[in-house]
Amino acid sequence: MGILGLSKLLYDKSPNAIRERELKSFFGRRIAIDASMSIYQFIIAMKGFQDGQGMELTNEQGDVTSHLNGLFARTLRMIDEGIKPIYVFDGKPPKLKADELETRRQKAAEAEREFEKAKDAGDDEMMEKMSKRTVRVSREQIEESKKLLQLMGVPVIQAPSEAEAQCAELVKKGKAWAVGTEDMDALTFGSTVMLRHLNISDAKKRPIAEIHLDEVLQATGLSMDQFVDLCILLGCDYVPKVPGIGPQRAWEGIQRYGNIESFLESLDAAKHMVPPDFCYREARAFFLNPEVTRAEEIDIRFSEPDEAGLIQFLVKEKLFNPDRVNKGIARLRAALTKKTQGRLDNFFTIVKAPPQAAAPRAPLAGRKRSHDGKCVHVSGTLQKATGGHKKAVRK
């Protein structure tokens, strides 16, 4: 889910912090990519329905290969542009996310029921819509994706918990320049730069959104702690929303009161019932100090492609077109041997003014309510990071 409504809010409140870029703008950059999000996008992009029958990309044996096709093609496209992708995979979800995951399971089950109704009615459009809501990336697809990337010589990192948090850790410590994901909570985890729409195909001509956290804070007058509180009020994966608090009210609340505690005390208890499981203190702590492997412990290396391994895996096992795979290997080797010109901005140090924090104000008079935001204890142990198809018919 990420952060509900944050993208629109930032376009309204800090438009200058967001730039529209082409893929080639990131030449020479290391980008930490949320792998699971990318794979999910590749799978749903290749699902469709016609005459009541589902269509998805498979090989001649009927194996779904959407994830491998999309990952191979898009990674090659980035490498062609001189980009150095680093793929980060999700680990164990935090305890705080349990309710959100259960909600997703319930929504997927409901989508399955709606799919069957649409199938009986012969409604291709509704079938496609509901089918995409049931998509889940399988463990097998994750492992196949890791294998493909490693054979291509692209770094793979296994996060101990949330991939966005691990990506943000790499960016904050200078191991990567930006996080590539659709989930806005990459900013909430502290990534200084975030890229959205990185996996959109060139044919759709949708620009990549480059968002700078320091400029967001400077334009809004928020400190990082206040920005995190705003994101929690907007709606995140770790706590339920407070009823009746939309984006504008959340924005005004943090601007006026400076933190969730003071804002909650200002609310009319009769109009805004704070959920008992609104564990905002734990959510805040997780955003500011997530479970990640320290960037200093991660050795990121780009290596030569394993030509024989790629042919064995893609051509012999997954039945990819040999010419396509060989051309891909040639592109990988060309990227390694090509003399890369350094980015001009690498020769300069840019110093920006620190953002100004908004000072908390006294609560409004009126009916008050105290909510300490404490619900559960979050703990975890850090883990070392490690570094010719056709459409099939679903009946």
From Swiss-Prot:
PTM statement from Swiss-Prot or TrEMBL: Phosphorylated. Phosphorylation upon DNA damage induces relocalization to the nuclear plasma.
Region (N-domain) residue spans: 1-108
GO biological process assignments: base-excision repair; DNA replication, removal of RNA primer
Region (I-domain): 126-257
Native source organism of the sequence: Leishmania braziliensis
Described purpose of this protein according to its UniProt entry: Structure-specific nuclease with 5'-flap endonuclease and 5'-3' exonuclease activities involved in DNA replication and repair. During DNA replication, cleaves the 5'-overhanging flap structure that is generated by displacement synthesis when DNA polymerase encounters the 5'-end of a downstream Okazaki fragment. It enters the flap from the 5'-end and then tracks to cleave the flap base, leaving a nick for ligation. Also involved in the long patch base excision repair (LP-BER) pathway, by cleaving within the apurinic/apyrimidinic (AP) site-terminated flap.
Residue ranges of the region described as Interaction with PCNA: 340-348
Binding site residues for DNA: 74, 162, 235, 237
Matches recorded under CDD domains: H3TH_FEN1-Euk, PIN_FEN1
The protein's assembly and partners: Interacts with PCNA. Three molecules of FEN1 bind to one PCNA trimer with each molecule binding to one PCNA monomer. PCNA stimulates the nuclease activity without altering cleavage specificity.
Main subcellular location: nucleus
Cofactor note text: Binds 2 magnesium ions per subunit. They probably participate in the reaction catalyzed by the enzyme. May bind an additional third magnesium ion after substrate binding.
Binding-site positions, Mg(2+) 1: 34, 90, 162, 164
Subcellular location: Nucleus, Nucleolus; Nucleus, Nucleoplasm; Mitochondrion
Protein name: Flap endonuclease 1
E.C. number: 3.1.-.-
Co-factor requirement: Mg(2+)
Keywords: DNA damage, DNA repair, DNA replication, Endonuclease, Exonuclease, Hydrolase, Magnesium, Metal-binding, Mitochondrion, Nuclease, Nucleus, Phosphoprotein
GO terms of molecular function: 5'-3' exonuclease activity; 5'-flap endonuclease activity; DNA binding; magnesium ion binding
Sequence positions that bind Mg(2+) 2: 183, 185, 237
Homology family: Belongs to the XPG/RAD2 endonuclease family. FEN1 subfamily.
Top-level taxon: Eukaryota
GO cellular component: mitochondrion; nucleolus; nucleoplasm
